[in-house]
């Protein structure tokens, strides 16, 4: 009987990527297949996030819910991976003794060995070391699930923002060699992938050796140029980037590489220089706006999303007003915005925070409502235009329709005869946008058209 693994993922796209790799590793070594039902699983893994307190506590809540499964089936293995595992280590087992495996983001490739050791010794296994980039040398070929794929190009972050736990849980920045990344992407393209998203905590800090052991270094702009030359790759995305290292070389890449989409996620975190300094972000609002101005001079239709933290210690009403002014000036398409959550061990956790929670909540609601107005306005402006989309899958609500994404990352659902679905999935097509919904668009097929850009 085939054994199964259930993985629940918290947090960022890096974690989504890592979760897929956990399934790949256990599939190759143990023959496990993925299940969406924990009750059916022989191995249950939680890939965790420690960026916010709520996500961290939810892990222990979920662990409590699977405890009864362990009691009913002592052979069931329960593991905790990701950033909470890296931060908490063996204390997870102390708090939840029924946990068998604790592993960090850099040691997920060791899961088969940890499982063997757990079975042989009868004791929980904990491995939260930072063996740099070793894990990529031990991962099996990726499973392809549609025409889009994530590719991790580096690990860790060396920025040490005052509020952020990532450098402590994922380690400092380490880049994969250029040829390793290109080989993986070429393999994906051979299997039908048309769009890749290059992943890292801070991708524009990428500095990869041209080949393993070489002294010549490729920066992020060079990597993008090489990826664009891989046959079959039609679109390039990346996340996440840092304003401090958004070089002129990278800006110029938007003029040189048409396959690089006109959509950018560039976290600003705040609109007040005073708060940015307290956050240790390393740039001013003016410097951030200068990057966007240069990019929009090259790509006037650039769609911009960001991350914002409301209620950072010491935030005044004037600081918040400056944030809202930045939102107005930048015309953000999307924002991942949250109330500040102090993380143990970070410098900001020691700052005095005297802003009432109800004030923080009011500010957050105002920010999110304003961003949502931007989203609706931008979506409505797309109605009547022809957009290039990559067809990804059948539509979730209607099997007679297909769904794809625009360059600015909006989902478009459109009708298509069922007999054409297999042919259209994975194709770049032009659709005319006929209606804008709150979080998606509706389109009509215009042309299957793989090379020339859509006409607006």
UniProtKB/Swiss-Prot annotation:
Domain TRAM: 380-447
A cellular component term, taken from the record's GO annotations: cytosol
Primary subcellular site in the record, as a coarse category: cytoplasm
Domain Radical SAM core: start-end pairs: 143-377
Reaction(s) this enzyme catalyzes, per UniProt: N(6)-dimethylallyladenosine(37) in tRNA + (sulfur carrier)-SH + AH2 + 2 S-adenosyl-L-methionine = 2-methylsulfanyl-N(6)-dimethylallyladenosine(37) in tRNA + (sulfur carrier)-H + 5'-deoxyadenosine + L-methionine + A + S-adenosyl-L-homocysteine + 2 H(+)
Chain sites annotated for binding [4Fe-4S] cluster 2: 157, 161, 164
Free-text function comment from the UniProt entry: Catalyzes the methylthiolation of N6-(dimethylallyl)adenosine (i(6)A), leading to the formation of 2-methylthio-N6-(dimethylallyl)adenosine (ms(2)i(6)A) at position 37 in tRNAs that read codons beginning with uridine.
Subunit organization: Monomer.
Protein name: tRNA-2-methylthio-N(6)-dimethylallyladenosine synthase
């Amino acid at each position: 009987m085939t054994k199964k693994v259930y993985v629940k993922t918290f947090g960022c796209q890096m974690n989504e990527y890592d979760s897929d790799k956990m399934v790949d590793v256990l599939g190759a070594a143990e023959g496990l297949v993925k299940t969406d039902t924990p009750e059916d699983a022989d191995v249950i893994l939680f890939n965790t996030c420690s960026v916010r307190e709520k996500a961290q506590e939810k892990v222990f809540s979920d662990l409590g819910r699977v405890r009864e499964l362990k009691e009913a089936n002592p052979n069931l293995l329960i593991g905790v991976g990701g950033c909470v595992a890296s931060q908490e280590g063996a204390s997870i087992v102390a708090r939840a003794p029924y946990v068998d495996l604790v592993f960090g983001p850099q040691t997920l490739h060791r899961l088969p060995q940890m499982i063997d050791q757990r079975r042989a010794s009868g004791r929980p296994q904990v491995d939260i070391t930072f063996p740099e980039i070793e894990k990529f040398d031990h991962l099996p070929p990726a499973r392809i699930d549609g025409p889009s794929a994530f590719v991790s190009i580096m690990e860790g972050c060396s920025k040490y923002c005052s509020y952020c736990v990532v450098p402590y849980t994922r380690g400092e920045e380490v880049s994969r060699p250029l040829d390793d990344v290109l080989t993986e992407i070429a393999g994906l393209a051979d299997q039908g992938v048309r769009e890749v998203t290059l992943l890292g905590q801070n991708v524009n800090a990428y500095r990869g050796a041209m080949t393993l052991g070489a002294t010549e270094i490729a920066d992020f702009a060079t990597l993008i140029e090489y990826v664009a030359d891989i046959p079959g790759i039609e679109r390039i995305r990346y996340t996440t980037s840092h304003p401090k290292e958004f070089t002129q070389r990278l800006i110029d890449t938007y003029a040189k590489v048409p396959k690089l989409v006109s959509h950018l996620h560039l976290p600003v975190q705040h609109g007040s220089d005073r708060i940015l300094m307290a956050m240790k972000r390393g740039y001013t609002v003016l410097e951030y706006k200068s990057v966007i101005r240069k990019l929009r001079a090259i790509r006037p239709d650039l769609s911009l999303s960001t991350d914002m933290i409301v209620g950072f210690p010491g935030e005044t009403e004037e600081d918040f007003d400056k944030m809202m002014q930045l939102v107005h000036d930048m015309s953000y398409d999307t924002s991942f915005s949250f109330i500040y959550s102090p993380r143990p061990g970070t410098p900001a956790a020691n700052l005095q925070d005297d802003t009432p929670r109800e004030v923080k909540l009011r500010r957050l609601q105002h920010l999110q409502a304003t961003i949502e107005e931007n989203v609706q306005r931008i979506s409505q402006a797309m109605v009547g235009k022809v957009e290039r989309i990559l067809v990804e899958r059948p539509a979730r609500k209607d099997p007679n329709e297909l769904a794809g994404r625009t360059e600015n990352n909006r989902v478009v659902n459109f009708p298509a005869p069922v007999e054409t679905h297999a042919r259209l999935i994975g194709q770049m097509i032009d659709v005319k946008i006929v209606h804008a919904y709150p979080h998606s668009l509706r389109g009509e097929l215009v042309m299957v058209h793989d090379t020339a850009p859509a006409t607006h």
